[in-house]
């Protein structure tokens, strides 16, 4: 996880195309300039970055389901709940599942756990569009390889 670059995903643990679900793992860095202000003497992962982490996990699920052919963009967040704090150095297990799609939008349900304890969850809405340019397509394909997105020909389904 590289907070300053909003790169929230470390690795794909499982991509189940048939079950329309993904599991991701990410470690919150032990140190980051973000923690200098959130909060001095008691560093906590900001809720907005936890939401971004769930959105990115959902995005990788949708990219997988679309075989990296179209780009999901976050369009809405509903029912976000934060149940406890996330501290530097903790390992996050992020799960996202497709809830429904239609009318040009897709909805996922995502949650984050630390040590098998749920820390937050949300319903996330995405608009899926063609890639805006070849640079974005290349970046997504390179990132997919870096985080270990399974070959889409062999991924669980």
What are these regions (language model features)?
Residues 6-8, 92, 106:
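Hydrophobic core residues within well-ordered beta-strands of beta-rich domains
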Residues 1-3, 67:
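Short aromatic-glycine motifs in intrinsically disordered, low-complexity regions
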Residues 57-93, 119-123, 127-129:
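Hydrophobic beta-strand-centered segment that forms part of the acyl-chain substrate-binding groove
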Residues 21, 88, 97-157:
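HotDog/MaoC-like acyl-thioester-processing domains
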Residues 10-13, 78, 83, 97-99, ...:
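Conserved positions in beta-strands of structured domains
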Residues 4-45:
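Catalytic strand-loop segment that frames the active site of acyl-thioester-processing enzymes
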Residues 38-46, 50-60, 74:
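Compact, glycine-rich, soluble single-domain proteins
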Residues 26, 95-98:
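Short, hydrophobic/aromatic-enriched beta-strand segments in well-ordered soluble domains
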């Amino acid at each position: 996880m590289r907070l300053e670059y909003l790169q929230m995903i470390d690795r794909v643990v499982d991509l189940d195309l048939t079950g329309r679900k993904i599991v991701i793992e990410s470690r919150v860095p032990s140190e980051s300039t973000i923690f200098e202000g959130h909060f001095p003497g008691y560093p906590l992962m900001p809720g907005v970055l936890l939401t971004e982490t769930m959105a990115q996990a959902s995005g990788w699920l949708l990219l997988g389901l679309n075989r990296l052919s179209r780009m999901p963009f976050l369009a809405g967040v509903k029912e976000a709940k934060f149940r406890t704090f996330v501290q530097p150095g903790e390992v996050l297990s992020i799960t996202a599942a497709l809830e429904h799609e239609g009318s040009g939008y897709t909805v996922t349900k995502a949650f984050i756990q630390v040590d098998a304890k749920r820390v937050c969850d949300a319903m996330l809405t995405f608009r899926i569009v063609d890639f805006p340019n070849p640079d974005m397509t290349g970046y997504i394909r390179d990132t997919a390889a870096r985080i270990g997105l399974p070959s889409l020909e062999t991924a669980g389904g």
